[in-house]
Amino acid sequence: MANVVVVGTQWGDEGKGKIVDWLSERADIIVRYQGGHNAGHTLVVNGVNYKLSLLPSGLVRGKLSIIGNGVVVDPHHFVVELKKLRDQGVKIVPEILRIAENAPLILSLHRDLDAIRESGFSGLKIGTTKRGIGPAYEDKVGRRAIRVMDLAEANTLMAKIKRLLRHHNALRRGMGVAEIDSQALYDELMQVADEILPFMDCTWRLLDESYRMGKHVLFEGAQGALLDNDFGTYPYVTSSNTVAGQACTGSGMGPGAIHYVLGIAKAYTTRVGEGPFPTEQINDIGEFLGIRGHEFGVVTGRKRRCGWFDAVLVRQMVTICGVQGIALTKLDVLDGLDEIKVCVGYELDGKRIDYLPSSMGAQSRVKPIYETLEGWKQATAHALKWEDLPVQAIKYIRYIEELIGTQVALLSTSPEREDTILITDPFAN
């Protein structure tokens, strides 16, 4: 069996939560390796909905779950989400949940800064969740972050807070916002220290020991590769690296420990927030996909923008992430359409290209080139075998495989975990 990385190949919301939940039965350990509580997902287990945004999906199944060093942790949200799951009957104890001691913390001042920028102060509206993710990563890179381990060292914490506030209070003065008192921030952290410290661990050592014992690890990505800070639609991206390579740097496991990369893609495309979206359908088709697919954000409730499947973008992320197989989700949303379009290339300034350029200007000018396929009337919803699928749906899947350059390894035909068709087992490689 192998260690598997799960990564979104679009702009997030691809259905990673269900796929991770389905794969978790084959894994011993589930690891979150980037992002924060800005990207949520819903698990449906025995008819019960579990909404997660920070905690790893494996907790619902009682699996050892790790929040890696690549994640920014809001300690107050951690406490809230922990309580919510416990209230739903999920047993969460330190034996099955560990948090990297060197994971940076999201503080109230990060949320403040995020909200101020999104209000238009910065002159660029990205469409963030205003949860402080970006500012927390800025402090990490700026070498001034407060990390989980700092909560255990109260005697040195105040000095670190004062160093952090020298930066943030200067920003706040410039924006005309009241400065933060160091003692108030210290008290804020001490209020949650006892809640989070029992889960703290040197997680890279735990993972290394587990790997040497033959344990199988599932790396759970958040958001999607098209939101990657380097390879996404910059500047309309998130503040972390969301590509598969981040599984190593965000967990402390080396590249040699990764054996299979499973990309997740919807059978169409969605996006939340601002930024380019070549195949967006601002028409009846877009409305149909949004309503049928229940396309509203788990964290924010925002309506998602919807469009046709963009094979150019998915192929690009398949290449960058080293994807060996795709889990194709929400095929059932397309049931009943007379015809289905797939973007197979772009036109940019009169020339055909087969990739999305990096510049914002070029991204805004690309025009999608479509191929039109026949739709299907027979339902794919709740199909459990390949043989249950309509012929035209199979043709659609095969065409996508041809365009993106990799196989469909799993097929999801409803939000229920049981409605999954396994074609190639990622853990068997």
UniProtKB/Swiss-Prot annotation:
**Catalytic residues?**
13, 41
Q: Where along this sequence does the record place binding of IMP? A: 13-16, 38-41, 129, 143, 223, 238, 302
User: Does the record bear Cell division in its keywords?
Assistant: no
What metabolic or biological pathway is this protein involved in? Purine metabolism; AMP biosynthesis via de novo pathway; AMP from IMP: step 1/2
Example GO CC term: the record gives: cytoplasm
This enzyme's EC code(s): 6.3.4.4
Location of this chain's protein in the cell? Cytoplasm
Major localisation = cytoplasm
Q: Where does GTP bind?
A: 12-18, 40-42, 304, 330-332, 412-414
Q: Which UniProt keywords apply?
A: Cytoplasm, GTP-binding, Ligase, Magnesium, Metal-binding, Nucleotide-binding, Purine biosynthesis
Q: Which SMART domains match?
A: Adenylsucc_synt
The protein's matches in Gene3D superfamilies, at most eight in alphabetical order, are given as:
Adenylosuccinate Synthetase, subunit A, domain 1, Adenylosuccinate Synthetase, subunit A, domain 2, Adenylosuccinate Synthetase, subunit A, domain 3
Reactions it catalyzes? IMP + L-aspartate + GTP = N(6)-(1,2-dicarboxyethyl)-AMP + GDP + phosphate + 2 H(+)
Under the subunit heading, UniProt states:
Homodimer.
What's this chain's function? Answer: Plays an important role in the de novo pathway of purine nucleotide biosynthesis. Catalyzes the first committed step in the biosynthesis of AMP from IMP.
Designated name of the protein? Adenylosuccinate synthetase
> Which organism does this sequence originate in?
Bartonella henselae (strain ATCC 49882 / DSM 28221 / CCUG 30454 / Houston 1) (Rochalimaea henselae)
Q: Please spell out the taxonomic lineage of the organism that makes this protein.
A: Bacteria, Pseudomonadati, Pseudomonadota, Alphaproteobacteria, Hyphomicrobiales
